[in-house]
Amino acid sequence: MTFRTDCLEFLGDRPCKPHKLRGRTCDTCPEFMKEKGRLLLIKLGALGDVVRTLPLLEALSKAYQGYKIWVITQRPSIPFFLANPFVGRAILLEHAPLFLSQVSFRIAANLDLDPTACASIGLAKADQKLGFGLDSTGNIVPLDDRASAWYAMSLDDTTKRANHATYQQHMARILGVPFHNEAIRIEPGQKRLNLAKELLHEAGLHPSQRPLIGLNTGSSGRWPLKTPPVEHFVELIRLLDAQGLTPVTLLGGRDELPKNQAIAEAFQKKAIVLDVRQDVLEFAALIAWHNLIVTGDTLSLHLALAFNVRVVAVFGPTSAQEIELYGLGTKLVGNVPCIGCYTSSCEKKPTCMDTISPKEIFGAILNELSFSRRPANP
């Protein structure tokens, strides 16, 4: 038997999908698609940053039909890339040098202003390198003019605040491909979706019967000011309860568990703590069953958008302009002159998040629910 290693479906270590699903044999397969070459994307950022990058994979796939997309990333992000239909292979960062020493690419792109990511693209054998790399002194630099705008925004606060383009638009420009609001594609699998539904049912939540609202109380450790203060969530739950919109779910990571449990105890069964963050795709599946998520600029926001869940997104230290909501929500931005400061701590009072009142969030929720006609059924 002959094996076509130049097929886009070829895996090398296990049977391909056409063989497993339809019994095709390699030497006579009518589904053979010749691999024209490979594209490399290096993405090492935080999980939310990784998820908002996923639409670019589809844009690349359209622009370079017949090319297999390889991704180099860190271990926590691997599940999201493997759950995206446009990724041909996902490589762990620690294994990257072995592959980069042997595999050649048509294009290698690094979208992160990160020294390790920039050093990695320097190892790649590619006809063209895009994004960011290191110069001979070890400093991060744009690899061509298309990356200069994002580079300037990252180094100059005035330029950053003047920006009106989304992250995806900027990255598509760096990659040299059109961006037509391609969606965030994540396929967690029916098993995870069913498990998430069972978890909700065990908590007494039945999203098919009434709107299910999730409150994400967390943010990454780097940006603690991305989320409203606890007292705002407490007041918001009171407002939602008076409107008959409880119980709500309380979402977050391990760091938010004590905070969420304290809030839940104050409201008994009107606020339910959901803790499935061990598996990021389980967390994604759980988000998918909601009708609306209240969240800062963090992972929950981008996961909600991936599953067409309405959002009320609050912004303080990070840029609201960069976030593409796909027509699925409302942005509430703190009312302070230093908005979008990108600082991890702040001594000012009130903070940017303090200026976004629970009543303002509540009003946005009611407005978004009026647009949410979908049953919570991914």
Predicted regions and their residues:
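Catalytic machinery of carbohydrate-active enzymes
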Residues: 1-378
